[in-house]
């Protein structure tokens, strides 16, 4: 379970993209199948630099085990947490503190939290943070410490790299602030609705996603 955007981010960089099948219980990435791929890749000297796991339907994958694999095989984790804004693993909110280099949340209207469109990337890496700020604004910088031309006026800027226009407007920000106040109630209501569906569909020949009761999403 993934989305084209997760693969596209690698293709934008000229990377080779490969896929790992899901665990039939959690619907998240199968770490057993990933281990097998990593073992083969290690022998072939073709280990991945990045793994992009998904917290499908807000249900977090096994962060602890994937972090151990990342240390063993020296890859970074770029987490697609599009569905998981407000998710807790145990008592900890989903964040880069749990092992990912970057955690990306979507603010699309069908997600738990919305600003009509857009999203946010969280990181504890200062260099990544500065690059993200640059890429969201056409690759432009105004920080005097990083400018080549030190004789500049207040209007002066330099383009360091190719970038995009990912700036959030004021209307979206205002909507997001209002949504933040309701986020916990939104997630509680979704859990209540999920329990209703599960209890009324038990007799059907359906397979449901396993959710660790210690987690909340």
Model regions: which residues?
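Substrate-binding/gating loop at the entrance of the active-site cleft, primarily
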Residues: 1-31, 110
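Short secondary-structure boundary/capping segments
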Residues: 9, 91-96, 111-112, 163-165, ...
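Structural detector of well-ordered beta-strand residues that form the stable sheet scaffold
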Residues: 18, 77-78, 104, 207-209
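PLP-dependent aminotransferase class I/II
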Residues: 32-36, 44, 50-54, 59-65, ...
């Amino acid at each position: 379970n993934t989305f084209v955007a997760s693969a596209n981010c690698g293709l934008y960089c000229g990377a080779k993209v490969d896929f790992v099948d899901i665990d039939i219980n959690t619907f998240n990435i199968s770490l057993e199948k990933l281990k097998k791929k990593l073992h083969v890749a290690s022998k072939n000297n073709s280990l991945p630099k990045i793994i992009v796991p998904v917290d499908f339907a807000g249900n977090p994958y096994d962060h602890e085990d994937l972090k151990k694999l990342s240390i063993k095989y020296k890859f970074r984790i770029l987490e697609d947490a599009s569905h998981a804004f407000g998710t807790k693993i145990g008592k900890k909110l989903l964040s880069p503190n749990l092992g990912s280099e970057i955690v990306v949340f979507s603010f699309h209207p069908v997600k738990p939290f919305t600003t009509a469109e857009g999203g946010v990337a969280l990181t504890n890496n200062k260099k990544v943070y500065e690059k993200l700020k640059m890429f969201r604004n056409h690759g432009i910088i105004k920080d005097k410490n990083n400018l080549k031309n030190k004789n500049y006026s207040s209007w002066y800027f330099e383009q360091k790299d190719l970038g995009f226009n990912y700036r959030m407007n004021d209307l979206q920000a205002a909507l997001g602030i209002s949504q933040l106040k309701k986020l916990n109630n939104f997630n509680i209501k979704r859990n209540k609705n999920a329990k209703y569906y599960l209890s009324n569909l038990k007799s059907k020949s359906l397979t449901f996603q396993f959710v660790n009761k210690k987690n909340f999403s």
